[in-house]
């Protein structure tokens, strides 16, 4: 399931923890590329911008030609990717109309080249070449995540829409009257904190509704974005963009969808048990007027804006004898650990495993704290900005246990990125998206009481009798997430295939959330709402 990462190589939005990966590169590269024609990619790879697949496949291709093509494609895409990565970093950490436009232009140059490369790679189908070259040809054909149609106008529109949608999400705020009667503007972090800490259902409902209102204006741009992506995917030979996405896992797209359902069926009984238990405990806390005895749980009561992780409600649902013996958030604050030192803890974790320290530039260029003077995309992400060693993270860190774990997860991406930075450019990624997230989550699972004692954050390791609390917390975060990750992809696939029409966008979203998560919105929703886009990975 590719929820945690909007894309892979050719969207250049991979591994941003997004988490996302991005790279950038030589400063002179971006300036030089500014002068390239918008369809430079097609010319670089030696094919006319509008030639057909039939024209390109007149004569059989040789192994030598295939290798020469992939070698050249890698060099050109590397430069274009680095230029886009740098521009996208600036846009994500300083959202303005100008930075969105610059990032969109750089993205378009890269996308044009990637589309041209994908089409040219298809002309080598059936060629007898070495395994490495064949793998590169496959990656060139399927690695696009935002397939733009051929033609400078529509290609430019795709990248502009992508930048604008992300900007709308990053700048989203809910305006309400504060306790003093004055208007106050709350961003996602502040609204999420209300859901994480408040125990007032009305206050939580207002925060939930407030954030979801920011997604309404996105629908028109989203519709056009889907239309153009589908057109681009069909030009590459896929039914739709969803089929393109599902083709990346070394199995047929339909087989991948069936495999995901098969795996979910294995986990579903455990999730249903957790859901029933949590619903019962919340009903005991809030009463039958707020939480039903049977049926879905109201989405605003689970401690997270999207009800994707439930760890923040652990104090409400844990058995009385399940106290883990420590409060990590409290301990961080007692020891006056600031945001930067939290990242230092993460770096020392990896150094204890034998890895080299992060580069000096990591500390100079990363975004650790939300700036007060500009808009940024706070969504936690790990970046490899030059596809080499310019590693960074982008987070609006809060001093709490959740962000302490997230930092370790994000650094897992960074150290993985550095581990493969000597590979050919097309191989500078995980074998598929799942590996990147698996590494991040495996590292996060290592944040145990034993580790916390070793680094001095707790004084003594709790006895084994306290494990139930720790295991429950893990289930609330990890098991609870699985159906959400699945349904986000199911939703996007259905939109791309046309199974879900624009008139059904919101109903389809809540139908899937009921089916997989067993949750419902806290108040009446309509097709004027676009609640799915209140989640970064949809917007």
Describe the function of each predicted region:
Residues 337, 391-408:
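Short pre-active-site segment immediately N-terminal to the catalytic Zn-binding motif
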Residues 54-224, 242, 535-539:
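N-terminal helix-rich structural modules
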Residues 402-418, 437-441:
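Active-site recognition of the HExxH zinc-binding catalytic motif
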Residues 37-48:
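Bacterial N-terminal signal peptides
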Residues 17-30:
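Short, Lys/Arg-enriched N-terminal segments with co-localized hydrophobic residues
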Residues 256, 260-270, 430-463:
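Post-HExxH zinc-binding segment in Zn-dependent metallohydrolases
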Residues 449-538:
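Long, amphipathic alpha-helical stalk/connector segments used for oligomerization, subunit docking
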Residues 183-190, 224-394, 461-474, 480:
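Active-site-proximal, well-structured secondary-structure segments within enzyme catalytic domains
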């Amino acid at each position: 399931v590719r929820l945690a990462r909007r894309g892979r190589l050719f969207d250049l939005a991979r591994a941003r923890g997004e988490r996302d990966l991005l790279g950038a590169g030589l400063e002179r590269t971006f300036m030089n590329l500014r002068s390239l024609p918008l369809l430079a990619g097609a010319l670089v790879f030696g094919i006319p911008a509008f030639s057909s697949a039939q024209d390109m496949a007149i004569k059989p291709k040789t192994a030598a030609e295939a290798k020469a093509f992939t070698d050249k494609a890698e060099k050109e895409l590397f430069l274009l990717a680095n230029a886009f990565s740098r521009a996208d970093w600036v846009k994500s950490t300083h959202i303005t109309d100008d930075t969105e436009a610059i990032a969109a232009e750089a993205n378009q140059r890269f996308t044009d080249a990637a589309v041209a490369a994908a089409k040219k790679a298809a002309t080598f189908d059936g060629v007898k070449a070495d395994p490495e070259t064949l793998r590169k040809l496959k990656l060139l054909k399927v690695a696009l995540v935002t397939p733009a149609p051929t033609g400078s106008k529509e290609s430019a529109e795709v990248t502009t829409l992508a930048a604008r949608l992300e900007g709308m999400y990053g700048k989203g705020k809910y305006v309400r009257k504060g306790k003093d009667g004055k208007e106050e503007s709350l961003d996602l972090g502040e609204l999420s904190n209300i859901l994480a800490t408040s125990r007032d259902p009305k206050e939580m409902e207002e925060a939930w509704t407030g954030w979801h209102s920011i997604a309404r204006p996105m629908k028109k741009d989203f519709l056009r974005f889907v239309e153009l992506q589908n057109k681009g995917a069909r030009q590459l030979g896929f039914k739709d963009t969803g089929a393109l996405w599902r083709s990346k896992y070394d199995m047929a797209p339909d087989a991948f969808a069936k495999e995901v359902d098969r795996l979910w069926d294995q986990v579903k009984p455990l999730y249903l048990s957790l859901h029933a238990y949590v619903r019962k405990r919340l009903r005991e806390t809030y009463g039958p007027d707020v939480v039903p005895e049977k049926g879905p749980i109201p989405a605003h009561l689970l401690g997270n804006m999207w009800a994707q992780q439930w760890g923040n409600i652990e104090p409400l649902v844990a058995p009385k004898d399940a106290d883990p013996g420590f409060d990590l958030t409290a301990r961080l604050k007692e020891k006056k650990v600031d945001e930067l030192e939290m990242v230092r803890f993460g770096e020392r974790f990896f150094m204890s495993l034998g890895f080299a320290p992060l580069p000096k530039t990591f500390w100079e260029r990363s975004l650790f704290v939300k700036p007060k003077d500009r808009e940024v995309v706070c969504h936690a992400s790990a970046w490899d900005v030059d596809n080499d060693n310019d590693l960074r993270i982008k987070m609006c860190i809060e001093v709490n246990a959740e962000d302490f774990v997230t930092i370790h997860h994000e650094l897992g991406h960074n150290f993985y990125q550095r581990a493969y930075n000597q590979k050919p450019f097309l191989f500078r990624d995980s074998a598929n998206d799942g590996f990147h997230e698996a590494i991040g989550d495996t590292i996060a699972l290592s944040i145990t009481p034993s580790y916390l004692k070793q680094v001095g954050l707790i004084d003594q390791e709790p006895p084994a009798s306290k494990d139930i609390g720790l295991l429950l917390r893990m289930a609330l975060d990890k098991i609870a997430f699985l159906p959400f990750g699945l349904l986000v992809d199911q939703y996007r696939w259905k939109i791309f295939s046309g199974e879900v029409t624009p008139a059904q966008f919101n109903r389809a979203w809540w139908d899937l959330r009921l089916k997989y998560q067993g949750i419902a919105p806290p108040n009446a929703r309509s097709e004027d709402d676009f609640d799915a886009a209140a989640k970064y990975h949809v917007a």
